[in-house]
Amino acid sequence: MPRHVLTLNDLGEEGSWLLVQQARGIPDAKGRTDFMTERTAVLLFAQDSFAERLCVSAAVRQMGGSIVFQGATGGWKSEVERYQRQMLAVIDYFVDCMYVYGIPGLATKVDRDLVQFPIINAGSPDARPAHVLADVACMLRYTRDDLKKARVGWLGCTNGTLFSLIEGLRYFPFSLQVALPPLEDRPTLETYARHCGVKVDFVDTPQQAVEGCNFVYAGCRSGLDEEMSQQWKVDDALLAHAAPKARVLLGTSPMQAIEVASDILASPASLLLLQSENRLRVHKRLLHWVFLENERAI
């Protein structure tokens, strides 16, 4: 059966740790191999994301593969949802794997019995597994491989990265405290944390979210008006509540994230570039993971 990575649950604890360590072990993130030679990946993006398209395309092409991209236009999403059996059979005829971006509930919408090729979730509103694996690699670097020392604070609106962070607590021993803006759906996240069987500290203010944290996430700002955006931003005053030398991660693209002061983004405190590098590493290892178990000779 094909292997899929729609959420971290598809990898499990052993697979999640393995991919993080393998990704960290790649000598050069942009190094070129021939692993994907004669393989084609189709990218189905229901929403635009230049950053995700760039990262996934680079991973496939630097490994010798080919890309077919389809953006949000064209009506493919409703066609695939309505005629899943027929469309998946057609896609299987032409490509070797699929990346999907921007489809909510992807893990439950895909009928795995119908899919004869690997599917990787490049990001959805309720899961971004590759992002969290890459960010765990960042945390390991700055905790000297001891995630029990990682205290993570999230401020901002909900997105797939936050859902995967909560899911990641099943497998990785960091702690997580979360502050959501007033109009966000906190009960849904609390229910999800209970479903995952993990402990998340939900607090009320950005200051409480970063209190004592050595990793601070600037989450999504999609639900914030201009006045609220000024109250929910990462600046020196906010980081004064965090641990000394706290590192700042972005939970989404810079244009969609809670505002981070420009001097912080340009400082060693910002892990934006390391996050990007590690995502490239993780996507390369994900391709190895989904394909190797599918090779009959292995």
Which residues does each predicted region cover?
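Glycine-rich phosphate/diphosphate-binding loop of Rossmann-like nucleotide-binding domains
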Residues: A46-A59, R141-A218
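Positively charged, low-complexity intrinsically disordered leader regions
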Residues: M1-L54
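Active-site cofactor/substrate anionic-group-binding motifs, chiefly glycine-
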Residues: T40-F94
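Rossmann-like adenosine-cofactor binding region
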Residues: H195-S270
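C-terminal helix-to-coil terminal segments
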Residues: A266-I298
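Anion-binding alpha/beta catalytic cores of soluble intermediary-metabolism enzymes, centered on
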Residues: L88, D96-G168, L250
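A short helix->loop->beta-strand "cap" motif at the edges of active sites that frequently abuts
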Residues: V115-F117, F174, H241-R247
